[in-house]
Amino acid sequence: MRNPYDTDDRKSFREMVTKFLETEIWPHVDEWDEAGQYPQEINEKVCELGVFGFGIDEKYGGLGFDDQFMRKDVSVEMGRTSAGGLFASVGSRNIMLGPLTELASEEIKMKALPDLMSGRKGGSLGITEPGGGSDVAQMKTVAHKEGDEWVLNGSKTFITGGMQASYFVIGARTGKEGLGGISLFFVEADTPGFTRSAIEKKMGWWTSDTATLYF
């Protein structure tokens, strides 16, 4: 009996992803890793496949549907390339899409999502902090309101995709200690007072763009 979830659409999608990886990624993996970077157009080519568009409305450039089996297939096929650093960097937008699509205003979504879906711009999630790691309950970055604006003060580190990202979702403390006092902020890379620096000489995943962010 045929697996009812192994549909023709899923098979075609998997084959498309595999063909792309075999022709566009595998031949260059070692070269890009040694160089510590990859061509910007790879972001756009990967995004053209739709691999980050699951669960995102078509009006934002997404696929307009979700499929957990197709998501799994993407992960499996990407894993076969041994290009973990590359896909960590290209895929850094993926870990910010959840909070962005669920919590952001329509104005922010219309601004950022089409850019992220097309690969024209990158995005990252900023949670991990120097000295505290990813223990969200102990987050030290703070935000306070001045007039109609929020001002962030602190830093984040080991942020995947942080040097090339144009958009960030940043966690900051706005209330009491612990998990209950954390808010998320949409931050653009050209925001006054925001700077970043690259983390170099890593043990591996050299293609992965990794940064420390300062507010």
Region annotations inferred by a language model:
Residues 1-13, 143:
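Intrinsic disorder at enzyme termini
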Residues 10, 21, 50, 57, ...:
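Buried hydrophobic positions in well-ordered alpha/beta secondary-structure cores of metabolic enzymes
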Residues 119-127:
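A short, Trp-centered hydrophobic/proline-enriched beta-strand micro-motif
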Residues 132-133, 157-162, 205:
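Glycine-rich phosphate/pyrophosphate-binding beta-alpha loops
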Residues 138, 190-215:
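Flexible, small-/acidic-enriched active-site or ligand-binding loops
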Residues 149, 153-197:
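A short core secondary-structure module
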